[in-house]
């Protein structure tokens, strides 16, 4: 019985491989090939560098989508060019193959589910299940019906020059821009001369971009060159800015003008939901300019390792676009000498929705903590709270824990080792820390049954990390 089930796929597999061995492979042959043989044979042709077979198989591809990214991880530009040559024949010839369905060339770095499903199907003979397990194609609705082919790509601009596959693709797209639509949903800029970035951005439909990450040591004059492109990304949902610096050669007047040019672009971003800003020095004294230009309710706001004025915090607490936040991260912002009333007001506004709160390394001291406790204890949706790196005493920590007792959704809490845990030289006194943790464990167990509480030390001068310990005195990580 098992033989009768496995024999048909084995015969199909042998027949398919004989097709690949045929040097005079014709389109008529492929048009009679069973659909289920295309994915495994395409993979084999790609791995064996059968360029002519690839070219013809692309033209006869019986699916709407060709997810090529997992295959081009194999370092062979020749096979990639063969696929593009096959697409050329589809785009430029008036007469197309009878079974032609290809509409999407997908070069996004997504899961390899398509190829895995069909490979397993070839081995097991369960082609019907393979068809059922295929994920639906995500189209680009802004270009539906305008061009016969859409090319999905993710752009990671991390070197001075592009890799050879992306260079080949962009050159090919540039020469055929009227015949296809290049759709980029994710753009990462990690390091590349801006003149090269500019030439790439001119080729991309900017309103397709949904996520942008810029992690470069850009000074403000370079940011001004990027600013006009940002304003055209009208479907942008997530923006990450990191390591933006103010050149010492920029005057205060120039800085204000540049910041104004940049922040006014946010008036056009009606889909923005997640905003991440790390080590962005131009925010100091100018956060109100950015906040006043936000036109949507943010779900995520992280402003980390930045210098902010007390007035910036006040503007943040008054911003109408933060009332539905689920994630708030202000770690690394020094608040030691500030009133925390603005933070209290901010927490009151987001109490109904906030799920993640990070106030690590803010330098918050004992006298400041009481200001935020009433608002914090009303954040009933909170599931993660991190407060490490703030030099508070044992008494203040106990008070903090007593206010988070009613937050039933808390799954993870991270607190600093109290000041009493350290010696006069600033190093952790292990015996004292063990005793303090035992006292805290008893106090917490009397109040509630926490899911997970960790206590973090100061940063280690050797490894640069902090160690975490749970209530049972076991080391968590370093």
Swiss-Prot record:
GO terms for molecular function: ubiquitin-like ligase-substrate adaptor activity. It comes from the Eukaryota. LRR repeats lie at residues 99-126, 181-205, 206-232, 233-268, 269-294, 295-326, 327-347, 351-378, 379-403. Keywords: Leucine-rich repeat, Repeat. The keyword Repeat applies. GO terms for cellular component: Cul2-RING ubiquitin ligase complex; cytoplasm. InterPro entries: LRR_dom_sf (IPR032675), PRAME (IPR026271), PRAME_domain (IPR050694). GO terms for biological process: negative regulation of apoptotic process; negative regulation of cell differentiation; negative regulation of DNA-templated transcription; positive regulation of cell population proliferation; proteasome-mediated ubiquitin-dependent protein catabolic process. PANTHER family: PRAME FAMILY MEMBER 11-RELATED (PTHR14224:SF19), SIMILAR TO PREFERENTIALLY EXPRESSED ANTIGEN IN MELANOMA-LIKE 3 (PTHR14224). Belongs to the PRAME family. This is PRAME family member 25. It comes from Homo sapiens (Human). The gene is PRAMEF25.
